[in-house]
Amino acid sequence: MIAILTDKPNVGREIARVVGAHKKENGYMTGGGYMVTWTFGNMLSLAMPKDSGKARVEWEDFPLVPPPYLTVKNMKTDTGWNPDINAVLQLKVIAKVFDACDTIIAATDASREGEMLFRHLYRFLGCKQPCLRLWISSLTDEAILEGMANLRPCHQFDNLFLAADSRNRADWIDRKSVV
């Protein structure tokens, strides 16, 4: 089986239709040798200082450096900041799909952000399967089929990921620098 990950449910459904994955499951579609699933945008974020057990940031802690790990995106609730339950549930679906497949296709947006979204999930879930990149800028049947015929190894997009990840870490530092 081959997993395809998109960053939006509607994109996932469109790609699933074209590749023949017509059977609807909870959070993914399957068929034609594919399992197509999706995220709801960025479901992961760089960890906050509190995630490492630090209750509050002191002046001595500056400059802050982003921790090298990711956490599930938090949402503001009545009881404070808690993991986004929809993200947690869909991450379980994505993990199940990835575990059932021997190849993963990154079909997130053809951009730095789309590449970072995929790489963060791939790393967060501890994936070891080979990954390929579907690079398309249109959801027409022709564009999807041409993209599927011209998949490229993910490592060819390493610099795109590094650019987005560097910007993400710089944004983290900028947000955390305000006391």
Tell where the protein language model's regions lie, with residue ranges.
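Intrinsically disordered, low-complexity regulatory segments
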Residues: M1-S177
